[in-house]
């Protein structure tokens, strides 16, 4: 009796760019041996819009509205880093109040970013219910943004060289405190529903494991790096804005798998709430209505009219020239380290403007961690990275 030998030919499968689980126009050319992934080649560039070249032909004030279209889930981070670069080059001070307002906006954006990651990620692995829960909370963040900036999701156009475009409106800090009180129990609700759910844990534990040294070697950042046991957060490392004024911890895990990345992001939302509460209480001058009352009561020369109580140091003229020199500045977004390398030549537009997107770097490790996994695991692993193709392709 002869024994039959079965041999499978490698099969090349095309995922995307039009696929609901691709998180944008990402294309993966995957080589399969049966159901096992042998190789994976990401094809990017479908959403390339030449953002760096646009920046080199615009003044800073003209370019700020563009940047929220890169990472359209977290536009405030790009607004912040784009104004930070000329500020540092020209040594422009930022009032303490403006710095606190920036932190409030950035931490709200971090929560919104993680919520928009959480819903689709869970939908990718088969949990549909939380997808609807997260939009309920994000709406409240959008309402806060709309009150302060006039826009909801993108094109907030709120950050300016030397501060922000306008002070917080009356009653905004109270609304922000209300959101913190509302959202804290909602994180507990998510955890009850998801964290120890046996189906969820069996589905993603052990998937896409990245060792600590691999995470460092591949230049990962954000939750991807911290989930592999490296507690590296630029808010602690670079001491930018006024993060040193607040009491908060860096969220990190050691396992390095999809589940660890989920745990890091959940904890980051809790830490962002801590920062928001402290910033609402400690903001110089307090709520706008209190600050205006102090200025009126105390008249000319009031301390409440001092530098640190202003929302912008000095409104920069449209003819503001970026000094000669070069500089790299970075900050911690919801996805990791985003940075800008700017080269000035004493002109209103930069000579060179290079943007480092966190998810673009984080995506590079995908073929490495997909090999050996099943085809059904591709979407779970890709979802855990948190990519937005607008900033990957730029």
From Swiss-Prot:
Membrane topology per record: Peripheral membrane protein
Gene3D superfamilies: Cytochrome-c3 Hydrogenase, chain B
An example Gene Ontology CC term for this record: plasma membrane-derived thylakoid membrane
One example GO MF annotation: quinone binding
Reactions catalysed: a plastoquinone + NADH + (n+1) H(+)(in) = a plastoquinol + NAD(+) + n H(+)(out); a plastoquinone + NADPH + (n+1) H(+)(in) = a plastoquinol + NADP(+) + n H(+)(out)
Entry's EC annotation: 7.1.1.-
Stored NCBIfam families: PRK06075.1, PRK07415.1
PANTHER family xrefs: NADH DEHYDROGENASE [UBIQUINONE] IRON-SULFUR PROTEIN 2, MITOCHONDRIAL, NADH-UBIQUINONE OXIDOREDUCTASE 49 KDA SUBUNIT
Protein family per UniProt: Belongs to the complex I 49 kDa subunit family.
Protein name: NAD(P)H-quinone oxidoreductase subunit H
Primary gene name: ndhH
């Amino acid at each position: 009796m002869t024994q039959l030998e079965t041999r499978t030919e490698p099969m090349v499968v095309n995922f995307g760019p039009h696929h609901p689980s691709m998180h944008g126009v990402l294309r993966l050319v995957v080589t399969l041996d049966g159901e096992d992934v042998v190789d994976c080649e990401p094809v990017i560039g479908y959403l390339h819009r030449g953002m760096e070249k646009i920046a080199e032909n615009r003044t800073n004030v003209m370019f700020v509205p563009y940047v929220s279209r890169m990472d359209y889930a977290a536009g405030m981070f790009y607004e912040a880093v784009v104004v930070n670069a000329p500020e540092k080059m020209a040594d422009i001070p930022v009032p303490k109040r403006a710095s606190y307002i920036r932190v409030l906006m950035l931490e709200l954006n971090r929560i919104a970013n993680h919520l928009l990651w959480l819903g689709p990620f869970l939908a990718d692995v088969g949990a549909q219910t939380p997808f609807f829960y997260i939009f309920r909370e994000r709406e409240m963040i959008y309402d806060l943004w709309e009150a302060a900036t006039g826009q909801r999701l993108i094109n907030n156009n709120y950050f300016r060289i030397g501060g922000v475009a306008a002070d917080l409106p009356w009653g905004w800090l109270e609304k922000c405190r209300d959101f913190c009180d509302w959202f804290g129990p909602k994180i507990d609700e998510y955890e009850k529903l998801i964290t120890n759910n046996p189906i969820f844990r069996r589905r993603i534990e052990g998937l896409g494991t990245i060792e600590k040294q691999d995470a460092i070697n591949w230049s990962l950042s954000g939750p991807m790096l911290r989930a592999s046991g490296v507690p590296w957060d630029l808010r602690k490392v670079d001491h930018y804005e006024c993060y040193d004024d607040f009491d908060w911890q860096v969220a990190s895990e050691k396992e390095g798998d999809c589940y660890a990345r989920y745990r890091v992001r959940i904890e980051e939302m809790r830490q962002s709430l801590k920062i928001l509460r402290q910033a609402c209480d400690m903001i110089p001058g307090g709520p706008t209505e209190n600050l205006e009352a102090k200025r009126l009561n105390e008249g000319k020369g009031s301390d409440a009219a001092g530098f640190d109580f202003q929302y912008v140091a000095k409104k920069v003229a449209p003819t503001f020239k970026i000094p000669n020199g070069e500089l790299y500045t970075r900050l911690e977004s919801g996805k990791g380290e985003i940075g800008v390398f700017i080269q000035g030549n004493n002109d209103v537009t930069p000579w060179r403007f290079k943007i480092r997107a966190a998810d673009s770097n984080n995506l590079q490790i995908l073929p490495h961690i997909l090999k050996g996994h099943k085809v059904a695991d591709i979407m779970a692993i890709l979802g855990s990275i948190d990519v937005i193709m607008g900033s990957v392709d730029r």
